[in-house]
Amino acid sequence: MRGSPRNLCRVQGMIEEIVNRLRGKLIVSCQPVPESPFDNVASVVAYARAAEASGASGLRIEGAANVAATAQASTLPVIGLIKRDLDDSPVRITPFLEDVAALCDAGAAIVAVDATDRRRPVPAAELIGEIKRRGRIAMADISTLAEARNALAAGADIIGTTMSGYTGEGPTPKDPDLDLVAHCSRLGSFLIAEGRYNSPQQAGEAIRAGADAVVVGSAITRPEHITGWFRDAVESAAKPSSPVLAFDIGGTKTLAALVRGREILERRVMTTPASVGSESWIGAIASLSADWQGRYQRAAIAVTGRVDGEIWSSLNPETLAIPPDYPLGRRMGAALGAPVEVINDAQAAAWGENRFGAARGRDMVFLTISSGIGGGIVLGGRLIRGARGIAGSLGQVLVAGPSGFVRLETLASGFGIAKMALEAGHAGDARSVFSAAAAGEGWARRILLDAASQLAAAVAGLQAIVDPECIVIGGGVGMADGFLDMLREALGSHSAVMRPDIVAAELGADAGIIGVADLAATYFS
């Protein structure tokens, strides 16, 4: 057959026809768990027929009897293989020439062989040559790029990444080897991605990485594995998780708590120590939770300012002076003896309100309006921290003030309201301004309306840029009596499409500590 030009043309035509049928398509591996209730010819054929009816374009079948029955029952091209457990070789897939013969006689259009560089009874090149001699398509199951090159040099028609992760002595990886797919895609041969493709997303990623087709097995035809995945997920979720040790460090007070989900199991409050970042400062905060050691495995800190990786720094030094490039997570981790996640307090509060509060599951922006103005953004179930850790920091946006451009929080925060009151001849803090407005003082109401107007313009711009489903307002100023009504009134001067759905926060002052604990328990774990 090898020497006949007519036969060579026929084989080449068959190769082109089959690879064209498989290009950009799904191949289903119908290989039951050994000795399972489905480990019989009838079940394999049933799997194959169901796969074909559901749109699969190829089948991967183990065992000559299964191949023969499937080839009779299905119109799809069959990749055939025989698995053996050998005493003197780790190679399992089609290790002998007689295996190749049996698969060809059974009707396999493609014969798969282990082409890894390991001790074996028959060289891979001989197996590939025998497949070609018998007029079938040779598929080489490899684990490395070098093995793929060697298989192609030996005449393989198709490369499969089947063996990646299965030839070493370490644990089998959880995810498929997309890097190997990308490297092998540059070799120019027909490439089938195979091995641990357990979700539609992973199969799609394989095609985008350069695969011509994808084999999926366990996720479709091994109910024992699928049941185990769901069982583990359900039982894991049902187990009470260890609480997270969470801190919310502010300019004036620090809260420590043990948190599980949205439940604060225990809490303690102290005045934030002076000398931010010093050894005594770290020690004082860590001592707040000293007798909780052993009750948590992770810790998390919500802080004002900018958090970029593990570095904490000031966005507005007037709010809290922080040493330059301070590695808060590393310092607190050493003091606590546990891994520590650090996140901006407003971003943590945004996550808390999205998971458990006023904006459950919605695309949202959270704004805390208190002594300063901070914010956080959650879109598509993901907290958006930004390239520099400042996403949502609306208070730092420059706006036009009486004497030039200033930060928004200079005009619309608690500090800003108190400053405007002082300039109008009325000493006191933001709380006293709200009290005066409630008592009918016109000067106080004008200051609050000015602050609400500045905030409304910024919020309308935020709606245009992010377009969230809602904007949640929290913080001492934001939640003060009457302020949200003033904000909504000020937004009335903007077009309807620019007016966001303004929602009051539900978690109050606990949003940050609940959010940062949940991030440590779920998002970063």
UniProtKB/Swiss-Prot annotation:
Keywords: ATP-binding, Carbohydrate metabolism, Isomerase, Kinase, Multifunctional enzyme, Nucleotide-binding, Transferase. It holds the Pfam family NanE. Disulfide bonds: none annotated. The lineage of its organism: Bacteria, Pseudomonadati, Pseudomonadota, Alphaproteobacteria, Hyphomicrobiales. PANTHER family: N-ACETYLMANNOSAMINE-6-PHOSPHATE 2-EPIMERASE-RELATED. This is Bifunctional enzyme NanE/NanK. Residues 1-241 are annotated as: ManNAc-6-P epimerase. Its EC number is 5.1.3.9, 2.7.1.60. CDD domains: NanE (cd04729).
